[in-house]
UniProtKB/Swiss-Prot annotation:
Record PANTHER family: ALKANESULFONATE MONOOXYGENASE, ALKANESULFONATE MONOOXYGENASE-RELATED
Null mutant phenotype: Cells lacking this gene lose the ability to utilize pyrimidine nucleosides and bases as the sole source of nitrogen at room temperature.
Protein name: Pyrimidine monooxygenase RutA
Keyword Cell wall biogenesis/degradation: no
Origin species: Escherichia coli (strain K12)
Coiled-coil stretches noted in the UniProt entry, renumbered to this chain: none
Top-level division of the source organism's lineage: Bacteria
Gene3D superfamilies in UniProt: Luciferase-like domain
Role, per record: The FMN-N(5)-oxide reacts spontaneously with NADH to produce FMN. Requires the flavin reductase RutF to regenerate FMN in vivo. RutF can be substituted by Fre in vitro.
Single GO biological process annotation from the record: alkanesulfonate catabolic process
Keywords of the record: Flavoprotein, FMN, Monooxygenase, NADP, Oxidoreductase
Length: 382
């Protein structure tokens, strides 16, 4: 690896096209996204996530998203055995921010759509119209078996049928305040939600299978996908192309937002040393559990998110795309991400969130041509 990689040069028209949104994937579970005994070990708290999101807002991040996880992977690090709840966390964060978009995740097997519709309308009120919902079908069977609500393994092949009905109920209630939807999974009888959201409620998904992308193409405002590999910032391009093609079939504009971990330092060698240190401490017991769970869905094909998460190539950070390098190198790679057709944004994680966001805002983002449109920072963040 070389330090201070050269900047890409774009015409003005390209710069306009390449403006890219940046989000932070907040650590709602312990230890963030590194399954390693050598990584920072910490519990999730409101105060930690408040500091992260306020710092992200200060540095002009566009959005913050929290996942939902109901059972972890165990192992020496007790990975994701300790988690906050997404909607209540994001409601709190909505109250202590003013500009950044806020997204919570609904585990749709656990929450009736009418309840999600009302909770979302409430957080819309708290945030002043800055809230949206990420819908997930659920892939980790033990999360739901422990509560006695796993619908059986046939659900793996019907989960997007379920989600289609779910989102139709949401759209009814948010759009008109009333639903009489009748389907295989849900029956609404003059169901009411009021007040309705102050602005159209954004729905996001993370479909990577054909069925997931078809769903996003029809119902989502944008679709998350995994980055791929280490320092291969455009390797996800075929996934973005599939999403773009699926959206063309529905006549909708559904962009891809790509998940990456940033591990940066003054030099490429220093950043690489961090990455190798994290890999050397991989929690093999927790990783084995993830691999076992990934093999239980035999009906959704080989291109699902969970299968990528468990791939041994970089399972230590669940195989999200990883950008390892100097500040200039990471900036260059993120500009390359922005050049991929269909890529409208990135969702970032960090090995250390508080210092990582500050370093990103101070040292990386100013070098990114796809973020050159941002206003100057005006004050220090607390």
């Amino acid at each position: 690896m070389q330090d201070a990689a050269p900047r890409l040069t774009f015409t003005l028209r390209d710069e306009e096209r390449l403006m890219m949104k940046i989000g932070v994937f907040v650590p709602i579970g312990n230890n963030g996204w590194l399954i390693s005994t050598h990584a920072p070990q910490y519990m999730p708290t409101f105060e930690l996530n408040k500091a992260i999101v306020q710092k992200a807002e200060h540095y002009h991040f566009d959005f913050a998203l929290s996942m939902i996880k109901l059972r972890g992977f165990g192992g020496k690090t007790e990975f994701w055995d300790h988690n906050l709840e997404s909607f209540t966390l994001m409601a709190g964060l909505a109250a202590v921010t003013s500009r950044i978009q806020i997204y919570a995740t609904a585990a749709t097997l656990t929450l009736p759509p009418a309840i999600v519709a009302r909770m979302a309308a409430t957080i819309d009120s708290i945030s002043g119209g800055r809230f949206g919902v990420n819908l997930v079908t659920g892939w980790q069977k033990p999360e739901y078996e422990q509560m006695g609500i796993w619908p059986g393994d046939d659900y793996f092949s019907r989960r997007y049928d379920y989600l289609t009905e779910y989102v139709q109920v949401l759209r009814d209630l948010w759009g008109t305040g009333k639903s009489d939807f009748k389907g295989d999974f849900f029956t609404m009888n003059d169901c009411r939600v009021s007040p309705q959201p102050s602005v159209p409620m954004k729905v996001i998904c993370a479909g990577q299978s054909d069925a997931g992308m078809a769903f996003s193409a029809r119902y989502a405002d944008f679709n998350f996908c995994f980055g791929k590999g280490v320092n291969t910032p455009t390797a996800f391009a075929p996934t973005a192309a599939r999403m773009k093609q699926a959206a063309e079939q529905t006549g909708r504009d559904v962009g891809s937002y790509v998940l990456f971990m940033v591990i940066a330092d003054e030099t490429d060698d220093a950043a690489r040393a961090k990455w190798e240190h994290y890999k050397a401490g991989a929690d093999e017991e927790a990783l084995s559990w993830l691999t076992e769970q990934s093999q239980k869905d035999t009906r959704s094909g080989t291109d699902t998110n969970v299968r990528q998460m468990a791939d041994p190539t970089s399972a230590v950070n669940i195989n999200m795309g990883t950008l390892v390098g100097s500040y200039a190198s990471v900036a260059r790679m993120l500009d390359e991400v922005a050049s991929v057709p269909g890529a409208e944004g990135v969702l970032l994680t960090f090995d250390d969130f508080l210092s990582g966001i500050e370093t990103f805002g101070e040292r990386i983002q100013p070098l990114m041509q796809c973020r050159a449109h941002l206003p100057a920072l005006t004050q220090e963040v607390a």
